[in-house]
């Protein structure tokens, strides 16, 4: 597959697309977009490969051989005049952050934040240290059973608690633990024990420029989750949550989108997760009238985008449905 470049056209490659074929549709629905959208995955049965894209590529698994993966990805980009690579899964984002200069030497922009930001987002302990430093609330957290037991005896924390990996994605191994016996059975190195906050959970898309300036913020109240991903949500406007989100965007200084999870309990807003990418809750943001992908392309084209934080539809219920696809494999 060889692609000729059109004047004033931006060609995008979304990597490890998985089931997120809707991202292609979201880019292409913009009448001003004149470029092409390609996708890739390591699995030729990924549903996102088959849709409205302008071509797809099967690439090696990034976590198995990152050097081979990066080399293959750069070759695909050069052969198809791809201007920007947009990764949407955590392990690949971390890998590609190490090779940004390799891509930039070929004139290709990889949409990933710097290593400092990624270390904060992917390591729950470092995330909490960062939140502590900037004065943002987070659940009480313990990385050993001994420390947790001491806090339990002092009445600082109580069951039930949340058990999750320090490095986690998609709620894998995350569970609610009701007593010490269950905790001792499930806990192992590389996990943390967290206070369970009772309140309203929100997902926020906090979008920054390449200079780390926050220009968009959309808040959604979570209604249902499926496999660690938002399944149903409703767009809301909440000044307490927005204040924390904008402050967080400024202090973290990420680029492009940050998918942030928060819980509001009374007047307190706790940050519980940071994902430096387009997350599973992005469709609600898009359907509410905020096309962050189009904004991203404008930034890639060197255009200025003014901040706007409240220009989206409120009380919009967004639900994911099951659709079916079939293709004949070669």
List the predicted regions and their residue ranges.
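Short glycine-enriched loops at secondary-structure junctions
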Residues: 41-45, 90-92, 116, 210-213, ...
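ATP-dependent carboxylate activation and anion-phosphoryl transfer catalytic cores
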Residues: 80, 237-330
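Active-site nucleotide/adenylate-binding loops and adjacent lid/helix of ATP-dependent enzymes
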Residues: 117-200, 210-213, 239
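ATP-binding N-terminal substructure of ATP-dependent carboxylate-amine bond-forming enzymes
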Residues: 2-111
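Short, charged, surface-exposed secondary-structure boundary motifs
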Residues: 47-50, 66-71, 113, 119-125, ...
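Phosphate-binding site of ATP-dependent enzymes
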Residues: 173-253, 263-264, 268-270
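Short catalytic-loop micro-motif centered on adjacent basic/acidic residues
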Residues: 13-14, 84-87, 139-140, 192-195, ...
């Amino acid at each position: 597959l060889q692609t000729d470049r059109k004047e004033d056209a931006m060609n995008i490659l979304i990597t490890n697309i998985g089931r997120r074929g809707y991202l292609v549709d979201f880019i292409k629905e913009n009448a001003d977009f004149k470029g092409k959208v390609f996708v890739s995955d390591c699995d030729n049965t990924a549903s996102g490969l088959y849709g409205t894209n302008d071509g797809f590529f099967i690439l090696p698994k990034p976590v198995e051989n990152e050097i081979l993966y990066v080399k293959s990805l750069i070759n695909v980009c050069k052969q198809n005049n791809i201007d920007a690579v947009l990764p949407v899964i955590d392990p690949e984002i971390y890998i590609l952050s190490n090779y940004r200069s390799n891509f930039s030497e070929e004139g290709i922009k990889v949409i990933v934040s710097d290593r400092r930001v990624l270390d904060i987002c992917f390591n729950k302990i470092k995330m909490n240290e960062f939140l502590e430093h900037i004065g943002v609330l987070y659940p009480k957290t313990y990385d050993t059973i001994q420390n947790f037991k001491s806090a339990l005896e002092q009445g600082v924390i109580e069951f039930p608690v949340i058990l999750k990996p320090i490095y986690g994605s998609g709620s894998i191994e995350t569970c609610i633990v009701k007593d010490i016996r269950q905790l001792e059975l499930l806990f192992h190195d590389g996990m943390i024990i967290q206070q369970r906050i009772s309140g309203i959970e929100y997902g926020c898309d906090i979008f920054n420029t390449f200079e780390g300036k926050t220009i968009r913020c959309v808040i959604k109240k979570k209604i249902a989750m499926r496999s660690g991903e938002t399944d149903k949500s409703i767009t809301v406007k909440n000044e307490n949550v927005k204040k924390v989100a904008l402050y967080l965007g400024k202090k973290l200084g990420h680029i492009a989108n940050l998918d942030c999870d928060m819980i509001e309990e009374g007047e307190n807003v706790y940050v519980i997760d940071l994902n430096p990418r387009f997350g599973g809750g992005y469709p609600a943001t898009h359907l509410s009238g905020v096309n962050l992908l189009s904004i991203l392309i404008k930034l890639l084209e060197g255009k200025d985008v003014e901040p706007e934080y409240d220009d989206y539809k409120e009380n919009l219920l967004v639900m994911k449905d099951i659709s079916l696809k079939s293709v004949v494999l070669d």
